[in-house]
Regions:
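Polar-ligand-bearing catalytic/cofactor-coordination segments
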Residues: 1-26, 42, 49-51, 58-202, ...
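Short, hydrophobic transmembrane alpha-helix segments
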Residues: 32-46
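Hydrophobic alpha-helical transmembrane segments of polytopic membrane proteins
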Residues: 207-217
Length: 324
């Protein structure tokens, strides 16, 4: 699924993206079949409900996909910036895109002090790379470290994993709408249609809710597994493109430290974009359960991989004194 660029291909990522979409598709089809079967058994008007839900769900999914870049920028309070407004940022991205032989995405800046970055868009032609003012002006990144962050984000565009994450999330949205239509249909109309079969309606809604919970849990875990791997793939590809894994190590460390200094309330407001961020907008606590459901691999795991890449490139290992 990777675009034709000089970013190192990642077969593991391609396999995982394909498997995730296939499994999510199967889960979605099975869920629709479950709703139809349950409502048919209860003599409810399943066909009309499914049709209406698919129309509304498909429409909202299409709008969300088509305007995914604008929606993400609005959520971040970001605006696009021209080369005149952000010459250094554009200069670094120009060099990286030339090095990777890929189309340059639009660039945007978010006014938040949270140090972070993300890439989004329905395809490479409509991609946008957004960085925060916190990353540009308050994280103390060197130019090489900022270049490492941007190379990581451009890798997501080149590998097309941003698109897969968007598609996967939309399937969950449509499934949720199916449940709502089924629920409200039976809540407000089921008893009148079924006469003395109200006990069937009472049983139908909990079963649909249970099916919904199972679908959500499976979708959640599949998306989280893909999300964590794609971050490792972007770290690796970005480090290999720049040939400077140590700069990315330093950037990860500085950004994570900067996030830990952000008030918890501000971090919560950034949660909707967590899956797309360079580093998760959460405070590091080392809790095992939190790591299982995390959108990103642990900082230690990411740094360990980059240290191994340093050795592969024949570069010195990590500085025992910490950041250089």
């Amino acid at each position: 699924m990777a675009a034709r660029t000089r970013y190192a291909p990642d077969r593991g990522l391609t396999v995982r993206m394909t498997a995730t979409m296939f499994l999510l598709g199967l889960v979605f089809v099975a869920f629709v079949a479950l709703i139809i079967g349950l409502m048919t058994a209860a003599h409810a008007s399943a066909g009309a409900i499914i049709l209406v839900a698919l129309i509304f769900g498909g429409g909202s999914a299409f709008v969300s996909l088509f305007y995914s870049d604008k929606i993400a920028l609005a959520a971040a309070g970001a605006r696009e910036v021209s080369p005149r407004e952000a010459p250094e940022l554009h200069g670094i991205v120009d060099r990286l895109c030339a090095l990777a032989d890929m189309d340059k995405p639009r660039l945007a800046v978010s006014p938040t002090r949270l140090p972070n970055a993300f890439a989004t868009g329905r395809n490479s032609k409509h991609a946008v790379l957004c960085v925060t003012e916190g990353l540009l002006y308050h994280s103390n990144l060197t130019q090489e470290e900022l270049e490492g962050v941007l190379a990581h984000e451009l890798s997501h565009v080149a590998h097309k994993d941003v698109q897969v994450m968007t598609y996967a999330s939309l399937l969950a949205i449509v499934a949720g709408l199916l449940v709502r239509f089924a629920f409200y249909s039976e809540l407000f109309g089921g008893g009148r249609r079924m006469g003395n079969n109200n006990s069937q309606a009472a049983l139908l809604i909990p079963l649909i809710m249970l099916g919904s919970a199972v679908v959500y849990a499976i979708s959640f875990l599949l998306i989280r597994l893909l999300s964590r791997y794609r971050e490792l793939a972007a770290d690796r590809s970005g480090a290999l493109l720049t040939q400077n894994p140590s700069a990315l190590i330093n950037a990860l460390t500085k950004v994570s430290q900067g996030i830990n200094r952000i008030p918890t309330q501000d971090l919560r407001s950034a949660e909707p974009l967590n899956a797309f961020f360079f580093a998760p907008a959460v405070k590091l606590n080392g809790k095992t359960l939190a790591n299982i459901f995390a959108t990103h691999p642990s900082l230690e795991k990411r740094i360990d991989q980059l240290n191994k890449i340093q050795l592969e490139l024949g570069q010195p290992g990590p500085d025992p004194r910490g950041l250089r």
